[in-house]
């Protein structure tokens, strides 16, 4: 049983904590928070030992009636690996300032830059390259979504080139300081966007160009893909391959799943904690091949799709499982992923 800690119990951190707790080969030793907010209180109520990353704030936690087990440094000393879910840019500083000095393995999130971490990870793309490594970055929610569907397509028939238009949510549901509220924003306004190069950190030789927008919604990201194929296949071949791919779901618009809102309603009906959708949803009706080019649309739940990848990264880096398919299967079974 490997000892895991979560540095940053926020949107991703709390989900990774629950995912790790669901496994039978790893356990959560503790989680960290900076402020005595509702998430800190919920962490304790959910049975996690809480460690504070700013020791000087211990009195504010005491005043709020939130039990503190110790400091973040004390937590890190107890771990085999830490999953860093701190805000963008903080993880890289933690790597250099703390983890490397302690000799502690660490997993980072997609907000960190690939060059600062040195290695990126996706369960379906480069699991074997991360086995036994000390530091790795789980690629972003958008990149994870692209890799989930492009990998099986590449395995089936090869890919010459990918062009993707990313329609990104403006903010997470709980965020009130981001937007837009009443605009469509090219983000970035330059082409290509950073998503293509991010995919190439795990699918090394893929020819991909991306462009991205921000829109006033909070539910999900939506991708529109155009994929030039190397070999001739039918739409039915693509459907069959995606159907058998873990963490990918074919959505039927004809059954009422006509939007990201419908997809999230489906998550509620599944009884998922926090309405999470770890799977990437591909609209079956959007699948089409014209002159050797595959077209399809997909939806990504930005708050949760990277969570199972964090669990797989733990197994790879701690050399708990050398077969990616076995880790994926084990993670999925424990988390109830379709």
Swiss-Prot record:
GO cellular component, one term: cytoplasm
Keywords: Cytoplasm, Glycolysis, NAD, NADP, Oxidoreductase
Involved pathway(s): Carbohydrate degradation; glycolysis; pyruvate from D-glyceraldehyde 3-phosphate: step 1/5
Active site residues of this protein: 141 (nucleophile)
Amino acids binding D-glyceraldehyde 3-phosphate: 140-142, 195-196
Keyword Cytoplasm listed: yes
Compartments reported by the entry: Cytoplasm
InterPro entries listed in its UniProt record: DapB_N, GlycerAld/Erythrose_P_DH, GlycerAld_3-P_DH_AS, GlycerAld_3-P_DH_cat, GlycerAld_3-P_DH_NAD(P)-bd, Glyceraldehyde-3-P_DH_2_arc, NAD(P)-bd_dom_sf
Reaction(s) this enzyme catalyzes, per UniProt: D-glyceraldehyde 3-phosphate + phosphate + NADP(+) = (2R)-3-phospho-glyceroyl phosphate + NADPH + H(+); D-glyceraldehyde 3-phosphate + phosphate + NAD(+) = (2R)-3-phospho-glyceroyl phosphate + NADH + H(+)
Keyword Metal-binding set for record: no
GO MF term list: 4-hydroxy-tetrahydrodipicolinate reductase; glyceraldehyde-3-phosphate dehydrogenase (NAD+) (phosphorylating) activity; glyceraldehyde-3-phosphate dehydrogenase (NADP+) (phosphorylating) activity; NAD binding; NADP binding
Residues binding NAD(+): 11-12, 111, 169, 302
Its EC number(s): 1.2.1.59
A biological process term (GO) from this entry: lysine biosynthetic process via diaminopimelate
Chief localization: cytoplasm
Transmembrane segments: none
Tree of life domain: Archaea
Family of the protein in this entry: Belongs to the glyceraldehyde-3-phosphate dehydrogenase family.
Assembly with partners or alone: Homotetramer.
Protein name from the UniProt record: Glyceraldehyde-3-phosphate dehydrogenase
Taxonomic lineage: Archaea, Methanobacteriati, Methanobacteriota, Methanomada group, Methanobacteria
